[in-house]
Each structure stands twice: as C-alpha cells, then as structure tokens.
Amino acid sequence: MQREVYVSITGLRVRRIWHIPSFWSLATKAMVQARSAPGNISAETRTIDGVHHTRSVWTDKAAMQAYLTTGPHLEAMRRYPTIAKGKTVGFLTTEVPDWAQVHAIWVEMGRDV
C-alpha cells in the first residue's frame, strides 16, 4: 500500500485584466514559498481554459495548513478577493491525480472561495 498524502487543488481566474500583474506577483511568491515549505512534496501550476490552477502535494494536511497561513501565501489570501475568484479542494489520497484528473476534480468538487 502506498503512503497517504494530502493534495490541494486550486483554480483561480483574474477578475480584470489590470489585476494580472498583481496576481502573478503574489502567485509567484506563494509558489516559491510552497516549494520550500516543510512537508511539501511537489507544487505545480497549469492554466486550463483561462483558469490558473495549482496542484500541491503534502505529507499531511497540517503541513499544507501551516504553509497556507504564513508568509507570501497569507498575503495572497488577503488580497485574493479583490483580484481573483475561484475554487479550491483538498483531500487525502494514495494516488496523486494527473492534470486531466485535477481539472475534473476541481470542476466537480471545488468549493467557491
């Protein structure tokens, strides 16, 4: 049996074209933070149908939550409502979804944030 990991999937759409520079500045800093955060196994991005997605894999939910509430990601969450809209979903699994699955899971199970 494989080890269980926590997968977090986000999908965000920038509200207005003039928000793009702020969005990418915040997103880039948050991704750098994620990739070096304790408990992070992987963190990747893709744009699918104009939606900016992330898929991050963590040793456990606590590691993801520690990242979520500190540093650049916390700043991004504070600014998020004014520059973007989207959905997130997180779950425990023994199989990390591929990108086709990521998008389907996000569409089906994502909750508005």
Residues covered by each model-derived region:
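Short S/T/G/P-rich N-terminal loop/turn motif that feeds into the first structured element of a domain
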Residues: 1-51, 65-66, 87-113
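Ligand-binding pocket scaffold of soluble enzyme catalytic domains
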Residues: 55
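An amphipathic, aromatic/His-enriched active-site/gating alpha helix that lines ligand/cofactor pockets
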Residues: 59-90
